[in-house]
Structure formats: C-alpha cells, structure tokens
Amino acid sequence: MEQAARAAGAMLQSMMMGTGMLSKGFYEKYGKEALPIITDVMSRGGVETGKLMQQMMPVKDMNDIAERFKMMAPVMGLEMEVVESSGDVFHIKMSRCPLGIEGTSLELCEALMSQDANMIGTALGQDVEMKILKSVAVGDKECEIIFSKK
C-alpha cells in the first residue's frame, strides 16, 4: 500500500508539472492574452476538484482545509508550513512551486492558483479570497499564500 501511495504521489506531481509546463508555454507564446483562458480553465478544474473533496473528505472550515493540505503535501513531495489556520483563514508557505513556474510572473502564478482558490471555495460552499504574498514565480525564495473566507 505504501508503494502504491508513493506511486500515486509521483503521478500527481508529474500531472501538476505538466499543467504548469503547458500553461507556461501558452503564456510564453501568447503573453497576457493567455491569462484569462488559463484562469478560466484552472478555476473550472478547481470547482470540480472542490466537489470531489466535499464528497470524499467533507470540510467545514479553513481548519479542515489545512488538514487536507497537510495530508497531501508529503504525497506531493512538498514541504509546506501552515503559518495560520483558523475557521476563516488558511495561510501557508511552501519552498517550491509544484507547478514548476519559477522565473515566470505573478500573473501566471495567480492564474494557476485560481484552481486552489476555487477548489477551497467550492469545498466550503462559499467564496474564498486568495492573496499571494510571495511567489517563486517572481524570484522569491518561497511561496506564501493566504486563503480567507469572503
């Protein structure tokens, strides 16, 4: 079972990197014109993932979201620090980008991260605001993101 979990984690990592590479290539070719399309696609994917999360691992608040992220981080090979977790706020730091968009732009980061914001919002059944304080996409040493209920 442990070997299967590691294999699943490696496949998830590869899929996320593939999403990042595709988005990065699209962004490099079409510039800012690509951002609304990337945001739309990622947002819709986040909604679908949020529906699955709510069915498989129901959440009530941001504390539950933090627990789900903490559970998934090692599977994804990520080092994640939960800075704050309350009923209304989930604040994290990560040492690397699971999408592999280092050296791109904050706008691309925001477009891709719309998936997480929409996943969380859908799972909670309410709108969620996302603030990206730091991003390796723009050369920061870590990513720092705050998700909060609106």
Language model segments and positions:
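Active-site helix/loop of acyl-thioester processing domains in fatty-acid/polyketide metabolism
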Residues: 110-124
